[in-house]
Each structure stands twice: as structure tokens, then as C-alpha cells.
Amino acid sequence: MARSLKKNPFVGNHLLKKINKLNTKGEKEIIVTWSRASTIIPTMIGHTIAVHNGKDHLPVYITDRMVGHKLGEFAPTRNFRGHVKNDNRSRR
């Protein structure tokens, strides 16, 4: 279910403060966050945000096409290695 248009998009306060501080300074540095539920807003464009996937922080470079999506969409949490081939000949 989509978020109501009456509400603003969710962005963690700590993340928003860091983005605004870097924008006023004009600096670019990696911002580490655990907030996968935060929505990407236009002020984040051009920044690199390291999003936690449960094990590591994966760096995500924010582009204009990502606006409106969540940060967690770009840091996959599961690693699928493929199905094991069932080789009956090797057991004999």
C-alpha cells in the first residue's frame, strides 16, 4: 500500500541533518546509515550513502532516477548462490 499524499515522505532526522550539513559546506563524503526505510529526496542527489544490509554497509551513489525510492531497495540483504546440481552419478 502506498503512503498517503497528505503525509511527507519518511526520511530519518539524523540522515536529513547530515545531508543538509554537507550541502551547506559543499562537501562530498560517505554517509553511513542503518535507515533503509528512508525515502530518497532531491537534496540527496550526488551524495554517496552507505546503507546497511544486515552485515556490511554498501555504498550507494544517489542519482536523479532514484528519487522517490527507499534506500533499502539498493542494498540487497539476501545472497542467492543458485541451486545445487543434483548429480546422482557422483554418489555411486
From Swiss-Prot:
Its main location: plastid. It comes from the Eukaryota. GO terms for cellular component: chloroplast; small ribosomal subunit. InterPro entries: Ribosomal_uS19, Ribosomal_uS19_bac-type, Ribosomal_uS19_CS, Ribosomal_uS19_SF. It is found in: Plastid, Chloroplast. Signal peptide: none annotated. One of its GO terms (biological process) is translation. Pfam families: Ribosomal_S19. SUPFAM superfamilies: Ribosomal protein S19 (SSF54570). Keywords: Chloroplast, Plastid, Ribonucleoprotein, Ribosomal protein, RNA-binding, rRNA-binding. One of its GO terms (molecular function) is structural constituent of ribosome. Protein S19 forms a complex with S13 that binds strongly to the 16S ribosomal RNA. Belongs to the universal ribosomal protein uS19 family. PANTHER family: RIBOSOMAL PROTEIN S19P FAMILY MEMBER, SMALL RIBOSOMAL SUBUNIT PROTEIN US19M. HAMAP family: Ribosomal_uS19. This is Small ribosomal subunit protein uS19c. The gene is rps19.
